[in-house]
């Protein structure tokens, strides 16, 4: 009884563990499979043209014959079909194909010896292959098994020369043997093409890759692919991770994407979890902070440029001295005097260059000094001419909300305003909370998912009192303008680079259409091969290793009648 109760308690957890919702889902439809078939046929033709057939030799009474150097000249594959077969299979059929051959003949009859070439044709070739798809231990899509059956309905050869009648007499033995040998070589060639070469193509699909110096993306398959009569569905984890804690898992409580459409070649769906994990990872990396520092107020202004750094909370972005950020061994990258000063740690990063260094706009600086004029004199009158510093720090991981009406991102942050007297501790003037809502335009370009953000709502308020919040009302519009003109371009500079979608190399999206749903969005697109299968496979084919002992070259067929 106790065991049964324990099982009932564990059952919900077990069901959740067995069916973790995907953050990214890809559906390939029958239309997409038709395009794959066209490229696949070219690949199959190339593989069959390279098949090797063993020599055929024998004896019939006083006739000795030898058939060698069999070469495929041409293939005709007029009827082929590639379709889905539930539950995990792809079926590839070729019917009524023909294969043109040429081979070398040798014949000895008593003292008569003949040598030459023969053209032959195999007609009514039928090939039936079934590929089983599954995920391997690393979460990568693989062809795990393949069955193949090949048959040749008929084969004929044209003979000429003085011994033509003799060859026609022996044609039954020669043609029957050649048909058997040829049919036995078709399936091994296709098995190697599927289990070795096509799997090497699937190895180009990104599974766990680094996006930049801070985060990575996990595209491992959660389960084996689901195949219906018209579609193939792939469930990917679709989780970003902080590179400092690569094994940390972020629980997925988002709505599972559901793809119902079948009109386009391929559909890609992303849940809110996909975007939330990206922002959570950047938050963990400590890079969602920005610091702006103005010039010192004096009768003769310093000609130096303002510093600007986008870094984590620490010496560069967490309230330390502005010049401390330039010391060796610090934790960020800062712009000072139009130069980028490198730091030993990679936890801080900046997306602007020296030509676009950030600084507190003069109008905003004047407004801030006027707003906090009384506070400055009450706290430290001697610091009235000190440079002004603004530190904007995200206080919690941003959250993404996807609705049929659009996609938005909610961000909570705090803004610290302080004066930085040279050689003395900073004087904090105000610490205010900030809530913003960004609209997100998601689009697919090539094979990269890109996001363009725009500031929609903005609100600041004091963390100390409602009275101070009222006093900060005049700063609302200037600070919103600051975000729109200086900070949003920096963010979009990063998000427009995008992240790669898990597709093999050489395959791209075209004619993309994004559709929003409740809790997820889908991208419907067509497929395009920018590279052929053979080109990609040859690119990643491992270089052959030299054998320890020289491999003997195959011997040329004998021209000595006595060696027949």
Question: How would you name each of these model-derived features?
Answer:
Residues 2-102, 142, 152-318, 327, ...:
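Extended, low-charge, aliphatic-rich alpha-helical segments
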Residues 95, 100, 106, 113, ...:
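Well-ordered mid-protein domain cores that form the structural environment of catalytic cofactors
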């Amino acid at each position: 009884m106790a065991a049964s109760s324990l099982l009932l308690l564990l059952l919900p957890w077990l069901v959740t563990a067995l069916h973790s919702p995907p953050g990214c889902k890809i559906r390939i439809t029958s239309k997409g499979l038709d395009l794959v078939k066209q490229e696949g046929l070219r690949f199959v033709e190339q593989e069959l043209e390279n098949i090797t057939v063993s020599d055929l030799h024998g004896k019939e009474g006083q006739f000795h014959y030898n058939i060698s150097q069999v070469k495929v000249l041409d293939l005709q594959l007029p009827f082929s079909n590639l379709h889905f077969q539930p539950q995990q299979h792809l079926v590839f059929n070729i019917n009524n194909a023909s294969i043109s051959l040429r081979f070398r003949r040798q014949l000895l009859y008593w003292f008569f010896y003949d040598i030459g070439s023969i053209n032959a044709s195999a007609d009514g070739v039928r090939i039936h292959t079934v590929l089983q798809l599954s995920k391997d231990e690393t979460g990568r899509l693989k062809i795990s098994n393949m069955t193949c059956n090949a048959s040749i309905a008929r084969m004929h050869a044209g003979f000429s020369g003085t011994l033509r009648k003799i060859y026609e007499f022996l044609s039954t033995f020669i043609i029957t043997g050649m048909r058997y040998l040829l049919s036995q070589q078709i399936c091994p060639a296709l098995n190697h093409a599927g289990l070795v070469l096509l799997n090497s193509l699937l190895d180009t699909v990104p599974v766990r890759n680094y996006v930049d110096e801070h985060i990575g993306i996990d595209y491992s398959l959660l389960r084996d692919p689901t195949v219906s009569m018209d579609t193939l569905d792939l469930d990917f984890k679709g989780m970003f991770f902080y590179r400092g804690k690569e094994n940390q898992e972020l629980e997925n409580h988002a709505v599972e994407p559901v793809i119902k459409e079948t009109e386009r070649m391929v559909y890609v769906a992303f849940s809110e979890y996909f975007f939330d994990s990206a922002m959570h990872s950047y938050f963990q990396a400590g890079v969602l902070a920005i610091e702006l520092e103005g010039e010192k107020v004096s009768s003769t202004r310093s000609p130096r440029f303002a510093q600007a750094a986008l870094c984590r909370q620490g010496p560069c972005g967490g309230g330390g001295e502005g010049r401390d950020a330039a010391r060796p061994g610090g934790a960020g990258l800062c712009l000072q005097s139009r130069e980028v000063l490198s730091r030993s740690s990679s936890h801080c990063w900046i997306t602007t260059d020296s030509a676009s260094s950030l600084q507190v706009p003069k109008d905003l600086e004047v407004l801030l000094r006027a707003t906090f004029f009384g506070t400055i004199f009450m706290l430290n009158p001697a610091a009235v001419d000190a440079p002004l510093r603004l530190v904007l720090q995200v206080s919690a991981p941003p959250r993404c909300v996807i609705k049929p009406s659009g996609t938005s991102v909610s961000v909570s942050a705090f803004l610290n305003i302080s004066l930085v007297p040279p050689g003395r501790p900073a004087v904090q003037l105000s610490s205010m909370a900030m809530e913003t809502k960004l609209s997100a335009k998601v689009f697919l370009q090539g094979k990269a998912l890109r996001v363009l953000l725009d500031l929609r709502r903005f609100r600041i308020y004091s963390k100390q009192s409602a009275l101070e919040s009222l006093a900060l009302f005049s700063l609302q519009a200037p600070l919103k303008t600051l975000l729109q003109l200086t900070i949003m371009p920096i963010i979009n500079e990063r998000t427009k680079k995008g992240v790669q979608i898990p597709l093999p190399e050489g395959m791209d999206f075209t004619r993309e259409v994004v559709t929003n749903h409740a809790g997820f969005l889908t991208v419907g697109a067509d497929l395009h091969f920018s590279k052929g299968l053979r080109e990609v496979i040859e690119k990643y084919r491992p270089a052959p290793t030299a054998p320890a002992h020289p491999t003997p070259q195959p011997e040329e067929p004998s021209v000595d009648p006595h060696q027949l």
